[in-house]
Amino acid sequence: MSQKNLVNAYCQSGSYEDWKAMVQPHRERNKFRFILASSFSAPLLKILKHRIFFVYNWGGSKGGKTAALKSALSVWGEPEALMMNFNATQVGLERMAGFYCDLPLGIDERQLAGNSLYSQNSLEKIVYMISGGQGRIRGNKGGGLQHTQQWRTVAIATGEEPISTSTSMEI
């Protein structure tokens, strides 16, 4: 997807009244309400000088995780176009986070990242990177530095299993 397509995905479609009627029945669910509020909070991080946060909604198939994420992204435009998935490189997600600065970052389907130790380590690095608000510092061919991506966002992600092995440990 090109950046032009992403920009065009931030658009109004339908009416506020129709959107409210669509989400109203789901607002009774605490998790849905929290994810929706998280989406609304993304542009407030800068104003309130608040840190980035990462919301991870996981559970069994058909639990409404993706539907909640799409509803949260529908606040801003076309959810299908604004949502990405974990079948991405760290650099790709870094550049998307920079592009989405001050807006929510929706990432669906954690299981697409895979289950190998390499995949798990990469996934944990991605979570830390997004939460840190800055991409990797890279040199360029001329001896200088490339532009380093920076962002403020609320990342909202979904999956059918824990995002990290440490989150699945019983206490």
Regions found by a protein language model. Give the residues of each.
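Phosphate-handling catalytic cores of nucleic-acid transaction enzymes
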Residues: 1-171
